[in-house]
Regions:
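Short acidic-aromatic active-site loops that bind/stabilize oxyanions
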Residues: 166, 170, 245-249, 409
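Short, conserved active-site loops that position catalytic residues or coordinate cofactors/metal ions
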Residues: 22-35, 66-73, 235-237, 268-283, ...
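Membrane-interface segments at or immediately adjacent to transmembrane helices
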Residues: 154-160, 207-301
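Membrane-embedded alpha-helical bundles of multi-pass enzymes
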Residues: 1-219, 442, 453-456, 468-470, ...
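Generic structural signal for well-ordered alpha-helical scaffold segments
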Residues: 41, 109, 113, 182, ...
Length: 539
């Protein structure tokens, strides 16, 4: 068993080392699962009882160690905002739950090995893993941060074909490569590698090199159609606790305007401010009466074509429980929703609102709110930083007076490829990501979040204009290159002429088809396992 534990921790180390933001290491993902496959094979071939439990335990150790090492910053961000025990409990969602789901994929692979061939078992492993990833981006505890395909974000030149497959193409590439390298290792140990050159070595070489060559060809031949628009992104560098505490909202607005003016041009189409840049809590119906709106309107009047996209903490009031998330105020007898939102303000005074749809489990929404409604008072006690926010069911596009369509993507939403693609289907010509990464501190979390934005640019072939409150703000072109970026925790503003794009990539048109296929496959293999179990028990 000691040997097996060494193997699983080796896999955990390789997975961590290959993960963003460590540069140039992502190809290691293509072999990182070989040690855990070896450990699993050792247990299957051993004279031991309760092999299933052993496989589950060893696999869980591997994936829990990898998840914790890669996204340790989740606890950091929560611990500073709530009691440590609550932060630790919520941190288990990304640390532990993801690891459990990954482990089940390996355990189900083991169960298939007992009743079918190795080849079909490998097919089952691929389907179970992809099915787990799709589940983990679709339910109330969604956290698709650790999907294997995301691991190539730091070396985006290698996965330009994500415009056809999305990140699930990367997941499939990683799983197939690891299986073939594992089979090569097994043949090498058995002394049969020479007689299996055609069956193993040639397919492995093709599988590893062909996607890279195709990607590099796309990368170096991709040209953007000229359709320029001048965009400004602003980084006010206001600490997240200062923002909601000691710094008056009017002072924050004045800083944002000053930074915007420092780089704005007569032809600037959009100024983009970060998540909750307008932070005082504003009723949407009466926003035009707010002093912040009037100040912003005066600023925009200085620019002929100017529009502003800004994060805003807003609320709506109802006479009845109009939404599932509506809260009731006993003193005033009204229902209301609070939103982590984006607002588009034109210099003509036209307003458009978008309510963040992908909410952070436990922090912005109570997971499975009907079943866990008893936790709502605990989350609500943390005020504006936590609790159940209102949301909208699908993305909506902001349109400027000149007809430009923009995708307002708020923070966490930027890790959903298909969700961002839905904006593009609705005629978004560029992506505006607004975020407040200061909660995480100076950790790898902020860097991972930035790198993932590169994947959205590739999938959709759209420029990304990224405004972060404390960093890192950036412009990313259609190939996923970071053209400009700010420093962490520094005030500033960036301007860039970007090329708007109206064409739809294959991935935008068809979305996560690989994930849906894998999910169907996992259902078929799960049914096979159930039938085999029923036959064994003679039910």
């Amino acid at each position: 068993m000691k040997r097996n534990y060494q193997l699983v921790f080796l896999s955990a180390f390789l997975l961590w080392f290959a993960w963003p933001p460590i540069p140039f290491s992502s190809p290691i993902l293509l072999i990182a699962l070989v040690p855990i496959l070896l450990a699993t094979e050792n247990i299957i071939g051993a004279q031991a009882k309760k092999k299933g439990k052993l496989i589950f335990r060893t696999a869980f150790l591997c994936f829990f160690a990898w998840n914790t090492a890669s996204i340790y910053w989740v606890f950091n961000s929560l611990d500073s905002a709530m009691p440590t025990w609550v932060a630790a409990l919520i941190s288990l969602i990304p640390f532990g739950l993801g690891a459990v789901l990954m482990t089940f994929a390996f355990w189900l692979y083991y169960r298939l090995r007992l009743i079918t061939s190795k080849v079909w078992s490998y097919a089952g492993l691929i389907c179970f893993w992809i099915g787990y990833e799709y589940l983990h981006q679709s339910w109330d505890l969604a956290f698709p941060w650790m999907n294997l395909g995301n691991g190539f974000a730091a070396t985006h030149q290698l996965v330009q074909w994500y415009e056809y497959t999305g990140v699930y193409g990367g997941t499939l590439w990683v799983l197939l490569s690891n299986i073939l390298f594992f089979e090569i290792w097994q043949a090498l140990k058995a002394g049969t590698l020479k007689m299996n050159k055609t069956r193993l070595i040639l397919p492995t070489i093709i599988l590893v090199t062909l996607p890279v060559l195709i990607s590099l060809f796309i990368y170096f031949t991709h040209t953007e159609k000229s359709n320029p628009a001048n965009i400004v992104v602003v980084q006010p560098n206001i600490g997240p606790y200062k923002k909601f505490g000691s710094m008056p909202p009017s002072e924050q607005i004045n800083r944002l305007i000053h930074l915007s003016d420092s780089v704005g041009q007569s032809n600037t189409e959009y100024f983009i401010w970060p998540e909750t840049a307008i932070s005082q809590g504003t009723e949407e119906k009466t926003f035009r009466e707010d002093e912040s709106f009037k100040t912003i309107q005066n600023f925009l009047n200085e620019y002929k074509n100017a529009n502003l996209i800004s994060g805003i903490e807003s609320f709506s009031i109802y006479d009845s429980a109009a939404t599932v998330t509506a809260r009731y105020n006993k003193n005033s007898g009204i229902y209301f929703d609070v939103f982590n939102a984006a607002v588009s303000i034109e210099n003509s005074g036209t307003l458009q609102f978008y309510h963040k749809s992908k909410l952070v489990p436990g922090v912005e929404q109570t997971p499975f709110s009907n079943a866990l409604s008893f936790l709502k008072p605990a989350f609500a006690a943390f005020g504006g930083a936590t609790g159940s926010y209102g949301k909208q069911d699908e993305p909506s596009v902001f349109y400027s007076q000149s007809g430009i369509g923009s995708a307002p993507v708020i923070c966490y939403e930027s890790i959903w490829g298909e969700y961002v693609a839905d904006y593009i289907k609705k005629d978004a010509q560029f992506i505006a990501i607004i975020t407040n990464d200061g909660w995480w501190g100076n950790t790898s979390g902020k860097d991972q979040h930035l790198h993932y934005a590169k994947l959205r640019a590739i999938e959709t072939r759209r420029w990304v204009a990224r405004s972060a409150n404390t960093g890192i703000s950036a412009f990313i072109n259609q190939r996923g290159d970071i053209v400009q970026r700010s420093k962490w925790w520094v005030q500033g503003a960036l301007k860039q002429d970007i090329n708007l794009n109206e064409e739809l990539s294959f991935y935008v048109r068809f979305g996560d088809y690989i994930a849906r296929g894998g999910s169907i496959g996992s259902g078929v293999f799960a049914l096979i396992l159930i039938i085999a179990l029923l036959k064994k028990r003679k039910f």
